[in-house]
Amino acid sequence: MADSITTIVTALGFPSIESFIGVLLLGGAIIGAIVVIATIRPILDLFPFAYPNARVRARIGRLLNEKQLSEILETESMEEFKNYLRGLPDYAKYIDRFPIEKALESQLAETYEMVSQIAPASIRDPFRANLKRWDVRNIKSLITAKAAGLSAEETVNLLVPGGEVYEIIEGLADASSVQEVVTGLEATEYAGVLEDALSGYEETGMLLPIEAALDRKFLEGLIRTVGSPSDDNTKILHTYFGTMVDISNLKIILRAKADGLSYDDISPYIVPHGYQIREWKLKDLMESEDVSGVVSGLEGTDYGQMLSEALSEYTSTGSVAVFERVLEDNLNRMARNFALKKPFGVGPMIGFLSRKEVEVKNLKVIARSKREPGFPEAMVKEMLA
């Protein structure tokens, strides 16, 4: 028997049984290693998200529930509204420091900063790029204030601590003109787009060229930072931020068509790097005759049906805000779905930021109702997201 085994082993090219056994053991070890790696790899991929998502879930637990929102809605004055928020850890430290809208948005900016700091290294860059929304928001507020002739104190009250160049922007609160603001920002990454758009403002007296140029720079930078999707998490980011671009483009086109503007009027403000709507489709939409043409041109996309369902309300009200609300609701649903679809990855972070945005938006609506006596309660409830 032993001789037969030796003969077989020799026929296979092995000099001895010992060498054959050694090869078998080595092969088993390699197979075992492959199995271990295949088993551990998913766990290793999830590990960087464990701490960030634990932090995020703790914050999700502090979001306002329906009962709390109803109680806030039932407050009878601005002071009572503020008193309620003083009892909430997330808002308490801001309520007595800033005017109410600035207080609410300051908490939102802090939330964005927190998420960007704890995001795993593999996806941190897009979250850092997303913080620049506060630079753009503050520059818009600054130039609006200067165009309106507001004082330095009034201007500062419009600025939210956040972004990368807040100190520079705040330092320009006493600027006397939009042109002086543009000059004061020449050392920032926004200098080029502001200088290019300034002539449009000087020719028309409208801030739209500057505001749209800032939006375009922000969105293009965000998409560029996400880059090409390489795994499930970056695919989600690419889809989500790409959808943000789609929605921004659609808002611009719908408003432009409601105002009777042409392709040449619209095209400088469009970002050609969205998720579903390609450049050729954007061109077709910009060349549409009217709002109805834009909606019908979206047939075959996710946006087509939802905007078609809102078309009758637009026809009766004449306000494109109905479309904007539908588009924003769609983005919020997408964020919630990602939180469920990728609960151990980037999903909870996107879902949380979206829900926080909605919370702050709702609080700003309620704050407005407390500030303006006689604001209809039915209108408030209709405006809540």
UniProtKB/Swiss-Prot annotation:
Family named by the database record? Belongs to the V-ATPase V0D/AC39 subunit family.
**Per its record, how is this protein called by name?**
A-type ATP synthase subunit C
Q: Where in the cell is it found?
A: Cell membrane
Q: Which GO terms describe its cellular component?
A: plasma membrane; proton-transporting V-type ATPase, V0 domain
Q: How does it sit in the membrane?
A: Peripheral membrane protein
**Which species does this protein come from?**
Methanothermobacter thermautotrophicus (strain ATCC 29096 / DSM 1053 / JCM 10044 / NBRC 100330 / Delta H) (Methanobacterium thermoautotrophicum)
Check the UniProt entry and state the signal peptide residues, or none. none
HAMAP family in the record: ATP_synth_C_arch
Note the InterPro entries from the entry.
ATPase_csu/dsu_sf, ATPase_V0-cplx_csu, ATPase_V0-cplx_csu/dsu, V-ATPase_V0D/AC39_subunit, V-type_ATPase_csu/dsu, V-type_ATPase_csu/dsu_dom_3
Which keywords label this protein? ATP synthesis, Cell membrane, Hydrogen ion transport, Ion transport, Membrane, Transport
The UniProt entry, under PANTHER family, shows: V-TYPE ATP SYNTHASE SUBUNIT C
Under the subunit heading, UniProt states:
Has multiple subunits with at least A(3), B(3), C, D, E, F, H, I and proteolipid K(x).
Q: Name one GO molecular function term.
A: ATP binding
Primary role = Component of the A-type ATP synthase that produces ATP from ADP in the presence of a proton gradient across the membrane.
Against Gene3D superfamilies, the record matches this protein to: ATP synthase (C/AC39) subunit, domain 3, V-type ATP synthase subunit C domain
Q: Highest taxon of the source?
A: Archaea
Q: Which Pfam families does UniProt cross-reference here?
A: vATP-synt_AC39
Main localization of the protein described in the UniProt heading: membrane
Instruction: Kindly list the biological process annotations in GO that this record carries.
Output: proton motive force-driven plasma membrane ATP synthesis
